[in-house]
């Protein structure tokens, strides 16, 4: 799975949203996800059902916004598992450039951001059945110049 993260159809010359979507549907990741997979993201992203739901509601917008990203420079350096559960994480775990408004709708800043992300997995029938993904969105937005806590305090 790790090697498949390096496949970036969104960076190909002439790539369109539809062509990237189709390549993600046909991406090697399909061999790792259970047909009834559930993906649970943080507030602002929500839950996705099935691979197509995951692609449409999280993966495609994320990849279109953060085309220039590096998983390995700082990386998911913690990997543990027990029985049917596993987890990866890092503090910070992804470095990326904010390049479009597809993810969360904020205008592109072209700022380099780091992301605090963890993935918790439930495996069933040899495939990933559920994936919980806490993403520190408040921290990402702060790096883009949006102080969510200050905005809440002002209300």
Predicted regions, residues:
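C-terminal and inter-domain tail/linker signature
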Residues: 1-155
């Amino acid at each position: 799975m790790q090697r498949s993260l390096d496949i970036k159809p969104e960076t190909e010359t002439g790539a369109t949203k539809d062509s990237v979507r189709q390549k993600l549907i046909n991406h090697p990741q399909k061999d790792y996800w259970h047909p009834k997979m559930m993906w649970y993201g943080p507030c602002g992203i929500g839950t996705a059902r099935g691979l197509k739901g995951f692609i449409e509601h999280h993966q495609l917008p994320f990849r279109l916004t953060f085309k220039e990203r590096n998983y390995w420079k700082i990386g998911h350096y913690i990997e543990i598992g027990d029985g049917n559960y596993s987890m990866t994480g890092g503090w910070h775990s992804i470095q990326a450039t904010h390049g479009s408004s597809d993810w969360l709708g904020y205008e592109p800043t072209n700022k380099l951001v780091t992301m605090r992300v963890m993935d918790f997995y439930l495996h069933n029938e040899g495939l990933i059945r559920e994936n919980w993904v806490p993403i520190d969105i408040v921290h990402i937005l702060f790096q883009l110049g949006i102080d969510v806590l200050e905005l809440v305090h002002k209300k």
